[in-house]
Design a protein with these regions (language model features):
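Conserved hydrophobic/aromatic "anchor" residues
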Residues: 72, 107, 129, 168, ...
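Intrinsically disordered, low-complexity segments enriched in small polar residues
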Residues: 3-5, 17
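Acetyl-CoA-dependent GNAT
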Residues: 55-61, 65-128, 132, 139-141, ...
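Conserved catalytic-core motifs of GNAT/GCN5-like acyltransferases
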Residues: 157, 170, 175-191
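Conserved GNAT acetyl-CoA-binding A-motif
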Residues: 146-157, 180
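Conserved N-terminal entry element of GNAT/NAT acetyltransferase domains
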Residues: 15, 19-59, 195
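Short glycine/proline-centered loop/turn elements that form peptide/ligand docking sites
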Residues: 139, 162-165, 182-187
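Conserved catalytic core of the tyrosine transesterase superfamily
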Residues: 37, 92, 153-159, 189-198
């Protein structure tokens, strides 16, 4: 085998003079400074409030595989058999975001490793649905799933060139603990990031 690396957040909008403060239950707080930022954040919150996060299982194989192919078109997408294994394994913690129309627009796959560590194996968001907070919501869900199963430490890998993902993980409390030379099949380096949940 190759190496395998539901609750909607409540949204509160509070207006204060020119700026808008937006807070959701996952702890996101934003103070936009410009009208353009305010409009972007409001549209992001509207998009996430119209989508639903739910558990994902073996029945989602084909849709998850297709979305994985779109999200990781750089050659790092998993094959169908690996996705099947991940979704059906007893130690997996998997969630998806469903948009209106029952379309899967994002997913996360976590696995509890033999040493008891939670491993975020894959986090994918459809390109046209990025920057709307779906990745943050899914990370919250997978961490909660790990906690319910007694996991206190979570790890993940991210490309050294993927600054956007690194920023998200750092904001969520992950720390870079090691650089892994030529970790990806493309030859790119990766960072190992770790977070203590307890």
């Amino acid at each position: 085998m190759k190496s395998i690396s539901r609750a909607r957040p409540d949204v509160t909008i509070k207006f204060q003079s020119v700026n808008t403060r937006l807070v959701c239950s996952a702890g996101i707080e934003m103070w936009p400074r410009r009208r353009k930022e305010k409009s972007l954040i409001e549209s992001m919150m509207a998009a996430t409030s119209q989508s639903v996060v739910m558990a994902m299982g073996h029945g989602d194989l084909n849709e998850c595989w297709r979305l994985d192919q779109r999200c990781f078109s750089d050659g790092e997408a998993y094959d169908r058999e690996t996705i099947r294994y991940l979704l059906s394994h007893a130690q997996s913690v998997c969630h998806k975001v469903i948009a209106p129309g029952d379309q899967m627009i994002a997913f996360v796959v976590g696995m509890i490793e033999p040493d008891g560590t939670g491993h975020v194996v894959a986090l994918g968001v459809a390109p046209e649905h990025r920057r709307y907070g779906h990745g943050r919501r899914l990370m919250y869900e997978v961490e909660q799933g790990f906690l319910r199963r007694g996991v206190s430490t979570v790890r993940l890998e991210v490309r050294t060139s993927n600054i956007v993902a690194q920023r998200l993980y750092l904001e969520l409390g992950y720390k870079i603990v090691r650089r892994m030379s030529r970790y990806y099949t493309s030859g790119d380096d990766g960072f190992l990031m770790v977070k203590n949940l307890a």
